[in-house]
């Protein structure tokens, strides 16, 4: 059987560039080479695409490798090809892209739209699902509209903060009580997030958040268990066992997720059957109403005594490192890391086949 040519796309122009490299390293090592011909494609922080001998190592070390070269894909569905730019020549045909990109310019619908123009199938959600899930404010509005509980929040733009800090502070303190989380609206991996306990910390937290995004939000603190659920599928998604995170730090921040490895992961999470069912049902509903495909990880806060469940966020391209919850939850559910990647690739191909059924010609009959 002919191997599928899978381009693994990593790096990118977001604050989660390094997280993407860690995820890509794990994926490149786990893809089934009996089924797939793997083509690593890195994106430098300046946006340049590279391939060749060792693009991942170059991005990890910052040392240019003479065996790497600039590449691109053209928005021509008749030619699904990876091109070398200098000299301009064909490198390989591409059957599918696995966009291991986290955050802006990767997980927010931008790359997905480009790949749609190119006619190349890709793992994960499309433009709409990716962009809705990435924007925490829009995500919360839609989830709340569909009866899914989320924490109370106040959103604002960087320009508003720069024009009238006092008004923003007044509005936040009027609507929310300390402690408060301050977040960029369009970033993941806890980059730019602060937990603040007073006005001085609030100002510092907002100053940090606006460095990363033009839209931010302040969100009430929910003193519950941190629960995560992995979802896999297209029109009929299935769920993993839920897992609990017991953070080593005050909350599950960037260091806890990717560096110090001191946070405790409890899989499966010790929850009642009632809560497990509620978490699974809410996760699948969120996946559907946000128009997600392929995979997502849903994060929750759970108040056990009241049996209340709040959706914190949904990640359409969650971390894939060796300590990331998305693959860990599937491993504990009986699905190996390698088989998970294979399933994701075939789900992407199935979705592309469904999209290809759409007619692009119109004639009145």
From Swiss-Prot:
Q: Name one Pfam family in it.
A: Dala_Dala_lig_N
What range(s) does the ATP-grasp domain occupy? 140-346
Glycosyltransferase as a keyword of this entry, yes or no, is no
**Cofactor binding, note field:** Binds 2 magnesium or manganese ions per subunit.
Gene Ontology molecular function: ATP binding; D-alanine-D-alanine ligase activity; metal ion binding
Keywords for this entry?
ATP-binding, Cell shape, Cell wall biogenesis/degradation, Cytoplasm, Ligase, Magnesium, Manganese, Metal-binding, Nucleotide-binding, Peptidoglycan synthesis
One biological process term from GO is: regulation of cell shape
PROSITE patterns per the UniProt record, alphabetical: ATP_GRASP, DALA_DALA_LIGASE_1, DALA_DALA_LIGASE_2
What InterPro entries does the record point to?
Answer: ATP-grasp (IPR011761), ATP_grasp_subdomain_1 (IPR013815), D-Ala_lig_Van_CS (IPR000291), D_ala_D_ala (IPR005905), Dala_Dala_lig_C (IPR011095), Dala_Dala_lig_N (IPR011127), PreATP-grasp_dom_sf (IPR016185)
Under the heading PANTHER family, the entry gives:
D-ALANINE--D-ALANINE LIGASE, D-ALANINE--D-ALANINE LIGASE A
Q: What does this protein do?
A: Cell wall formation.
- What's the protein name? D-alanine--D-alanine ligase
The organism named in the record is Natranaerobius thermophilus (strain ATCC BAA-1301 / DSM 18059 / JW/NM-WN-LF)
The organism's lineage is: Bacteria, Bacillati, Bacillota, Clostridia, Natranaerobiales
Name the gene behind this protein.
ddl
